[in-house]
């Protein structure tokens, strides 16, 4: 299979899975394993196509991101979504990521560990659906600092490949009495700085694996993930309020079972 086709397939996988509660990292590792595209070059490629998904969110939420630069609501202690909400949502995962980065990259980026993450994340999502209470926050401006921190703590679970950043943060939001749409949007916004930081750190450590010959492949993957992520996010927000997290959780469990039976055993 040509590199361009592999790039196109993995770009679709990244764009679909990055902001859905199904784990993009897990899917990239599993699909890469099936395609025979593994190793340091594959890891570097995954970093680059994540940038496409990051750009999609930055464009979709550019107005909200620009508004975070206004510190007046924060200084006036207004009950309005501001940069401190994002800080509380990001800080725990940044600390966890920095402390565990090398361990995770060395030991946890394996198909069998991803299967564990898929199942564990699915259990959390089902638990959140069962235990959620009536929401008190129906928009980002309703979000309290405590709710933001709670979601940020749940984001720490996403450092484990296969767990899913969206799955863990949206689950945390539901348990903190935040509705689906608000939890999802906050999940997207706090994913940006974490992903940019993690991607930057990975690129610094992986730049030696980059080659001029890889530019066409990496470009196809980047563009594909960008376009697919744009479409996936808009569709997901509409779909989530109708069906909740359980269908995604069941899909994760089914995927883990199928991959274990047909590939790992």
Curated annotation (Swiss-Prot):
Its EC number is 3.6.1.27. The chain crosses the membrane at residues 4-24, 42-62, 84-104, 108-128, 184-204, 217-237, 245-265. One of its GO terms (cellular component) is plasma membrane. It is a multi-pass membrane protein. InterPro entries: UppP. It is found in: Cell membrane. It comes from the Bacteria. Bacitracin is thought to be involved in the inhibition of peptidoglycan synthesis by sequestering undecaprenyl diphosphate, thereby reducing the pool of lipid carrier available. Belongs to the UppP family. This is Undecaprenyl-diphosphatase 1. It comes from Bacillus thuringiensis (strain Al Hakam).
């Amino acid at each position: 299979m040509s590199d361009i086709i592999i790039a196109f397939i993995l770009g679709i996988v990244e764009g679909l899975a990055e902001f859905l509660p199904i784990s993009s990292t897990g899917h990239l590792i599993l699909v890469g394993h099936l395609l025979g595209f593994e190793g340091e070059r594959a890891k570097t490629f995954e970093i680059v196509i994540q940038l496409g998904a990051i750009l999609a969110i930055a464009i979709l939420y550019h107005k909200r991101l620009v508004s975070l630069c206004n510190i007046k609501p924060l200084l006036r202690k207004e009950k309005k979504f501001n940069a401190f909400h994002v800080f509380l949502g990001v800080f725990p995962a940044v600390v966890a990521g920095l402390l565990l980065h090398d361990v995770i990259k060395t030991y946890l980026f394996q198909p069998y560990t991803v299967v564990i993450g898929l199942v564990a994340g699915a259990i959390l999502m089902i638990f959140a659906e069962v235990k959620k209470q009536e929401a008190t926050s129906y928009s980002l401006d309703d979000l309290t600092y405590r709710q933001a921190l709670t979601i940020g703590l749940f984001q720490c679970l996403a450092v484990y490949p296969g767990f899913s950043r969206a799955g863990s943060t949206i689950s945390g939001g539901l348990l903190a009495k935040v509705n689906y749409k608000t939890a999802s949007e906050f999940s997207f916004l706090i994913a940006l700085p974490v992903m940019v930081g993690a991607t930057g750190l990975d690129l610094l450590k992986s730049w030696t694996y980059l080659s001029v010959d890889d530019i066409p492949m990496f470009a196809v993957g980047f563009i594909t993930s960008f376009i697919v992520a744009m479409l996936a996010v808009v569709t997901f927000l509409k779909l989530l309020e109708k069906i909740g997290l359980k269908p995604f959780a069941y899909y994760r469990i089914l995927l883990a079972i199928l991959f274990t039976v047909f590939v790992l055993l």
